[in-house]
Curated annotation (Swiss-Prot):
Its EC number is 3.6.5.-. It comes from Acidobacterium capsulatum (strain ATCC 51196 / DSM 11244 / BCRC 80197 / JCM 7670 / NBRC 15755 / NCIMB 13165 / 161). CDD domains: Obg (cd01898). The gene is obg. Residues 159-333 form the OBG-type G domain. It is an enzyme of class 3 (hydrolase). This is GTPase Obg. The keyword RNA-binding does not apply. The lineage of its organism: Bacteria, Pseudomonadati, Acidobacteriota, Terriglobia, Terriglobales. Residues 121-140 are annotated as: Disordered. It is found in: Cytoplasm.
């Protein structure tokens, strides 16, 4: 888990100005005031969604300004209201006023809505200022300004997917391929000393989806008892939706049996306890750019026997990475729906 933060500036739309106008029609030489009111400025609205689970969008888009209302017109025509801006935030986002520190809202369920900045009221046209003794008023109101705030967004991010496997099987290279994360990568075990989190984006705005992958530091036999980098990293996997288990099928690993490698790590996950043993798994044959065909065949047969999804990739050349990325996105989407139903 890590804390994702973003600071944004929101400005609701100003109200439109009221109009000063008089009725001018044939045979009506002294028409009364007919100035319409200005439209209301657009609000800035936050809405929680399960389609995203990071604040990455707000890091790159810190300024949000709603449309102002249109000015009033003659013939008592009111100006059009400004369009609201809907900002989609992940469930779990906490919103603070950055200047006062006041907690504004904690989005705990999907589809919650909060107006974080109200649009300004439109000004009144001169029709409102007519009286029995003042029948041709020239007064009219300017629109009122929309609210403007600096907000701080905070989100506790949990990885959707944990990438597991022996040290040096290509986990860090994979996460650098499918996300913007830049983990330290080298050809020796335990390069990764802390979990690396990467945000993966699939699709394009406004329909893009994101999910978070955690590159869990290499596990070895006895990890649940603290061997290698210890059981503290297994705790990072505990709250993920899905495991992607990388197995080296090249000769570089120095280990002759990929099925034994898979079973060793699977046993460590099971021995740790909790729900790790029952998590959905995608099996991935890694380093197929220098594949040992016998190893690949053995691993594929094992995955088929266990009815587990199976993919072949080379994170170095990119072969098979896109197919795996979209399979991960589809599985996360399904698991999020299941979780929502259970809740």
């Amino acid at each position: 888990m890590f804390i994702d933060e973003a600071k944004i500036r929101v400005k609701a739309g100003d109200g439109g100005n009221g109009c000063m106008a008089f009725r001018r029609e044939k045979f009506v030489p002294r028409g009364g005031p007919s100035g319409g009111d200005g439209g209301r400025g657009g609000d800035i609205v936050m809405e929680s969604t399960q389609r995203h689970n990071t604040l990455l969008y707000f890091r790159y888009n810190p300024e949000h300004k709603a449309e102002r209302g249109e000015h009033g017109m003659g013939s008592n025509c009111t100006g059009r209201d400004g369009k609201d801006i809907i900002l989609k935030v992940p469930v779990g986002t906490v919103v603070y006023n950055a200047e006062s520190g006041e907690l504004l809202h904690d989005f705990q369920q999907p589809d919650e809505r909060l107006i974080v900045a109200h649009g300004g009221r439109g000004g009144r046209g001169n029709q409102h200022f007519a009286t029995s003794t003042h029948q041709a008023p020239r007064e009219h109101e300017m629109g009122y300004p929309g609210e403007e705030f600096t907000l701080r967004l905070e989100l506790k991010v949990l990885a959707d997917i944990g990438i597991v496997g022996y040290p040096n099987v290509g986990k860090s290279t994979l996460i650098s391929r499918i996300s913007a994360a830049k983990p330290k990568i080298a050809d020796y075990p335990f390069t990764t000393l802390e979990p690396n989190l990467g945000v993966v984006t699939v699709g394009e705005m406004p329909h893009e989806e994101t999910f978070v992958v955690a590159d869990i530091p290499g596990l070895i036999e006895g990890a649940h008892e603290g061997a290698g980098l210890g059981d503290r990293f297994l705790r990072h996997v505990e709250r993920t939706h899905l495991l992607v288990h990388l197995v080296d099928v090249s000769d570089a690993s120095g280990r002759p049996d990929p099925v034994a490698d898979y079973k060793t790590i699977a046993a460590e996950l099971a021995n740790f306890g909790g729900e790790l043993e029952d998590k959905p798994v995608i099996v991935v044959a890694s380093k197929i750019d220098s594949v040992n065909p016998d190893k690949l065949k053995k691993l594929a047969a094992m995955a088929k026997r266990r009815k587990l999804p199976f993919y072949e990739i080379s994170a170095v050349t990119g072969q098979g990475v896109q197919q795996l990325k979209y399979a991960m996105a589809e599985r996360v989407r399904e698991l999020r729906k299941q979780t929502q139903i259970e809740l």
